[in-house]
Regions:
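Noncatalytic, beta-rich nucleic-acid-contacting surfaces in large DNA/RNA-processing enzymes
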Residues: 1-182
Length: 182
């Protein structure tokens, strides 16, 4: 879903829709899609008035799928959290003019996304690894898959999957041989 939306929005910037205008400044660099953990934290901070620390605690709870914590935080995200002295630890979206239905929808998006998000500072390293992996698989498919097969030697399901991939590429796989194998 998110990948398709990202690609569509990248090619058709006019199709980008934000559930609330406050999301534009946060998500415009990623074509209206949540990609980075930092974006989730920024949404908590800017839409609901969370502190940096509390936003990070919620981000970690989401990534670890701590449902009880997340449901409590949903209430705070939407309606705010009042301290014992009557002040607000966080305002909540409703107090900041965002309808509860919209706030709940944004929270749902963040919850489903959070377990797949990654740290923005790591994205360049991931991109380099992905690029190099794709290059090796494209230009050296037999050698790439040989290394891949070695890495999953104990998993017959993955071995079968990779051998099928080689067959699709019309690359022959030889059986092990005591006379010829290294």
């Amino acid at each position: 879903d998110s990948i398709d939306m990202y690609i569509n929005n990248r090619h058709n910037p006019k199709s980008i829709r934000y559930k609330t205008p406050q999301l534009k400044n946060i998500l415009d660099v990623t074509y209206g899609c949540m990609v980075y953990q930092e974006q989730v934290m920024q949404i908590f901070r800017e839409l609901a008035g969370y502190s940096f620390g509390r936003a990070d605690v919620v981000r970690r709870a989401m990534s670890k799928k701590k449902h009880k914590v997340m449901e409590q935080e949903r209430e705070y995200f939407v309606n705010g959290l009042k301290n014992s002295d009557g002040t607000y630890a966080c305002d909540g979206c409703v107090r900041r003019g965002i309808p509860a239905e919209v706030a709940n929808s944004i929270f749902d998006d963040m919850s489903s996304f959070a377990s797949y998000a990654f740290n923005k500072s790591h994205s360049a390293a991931y991109a380099v690894i992905a690029y190099r992996t794709a290059y090796l698989k494209c230009h050296f498919p037999a050698q790439f898959t040989a290394a891949l097969l070695t890495s999953v030697i104990d998993d017959s399901t993955k071995i079968a999957l990779y051998i099928d991939d080689l067959a699709r590429l019309k690359i022959n796989v030889l059986s092990p041989s005591v006379n010829e194998s290294f």
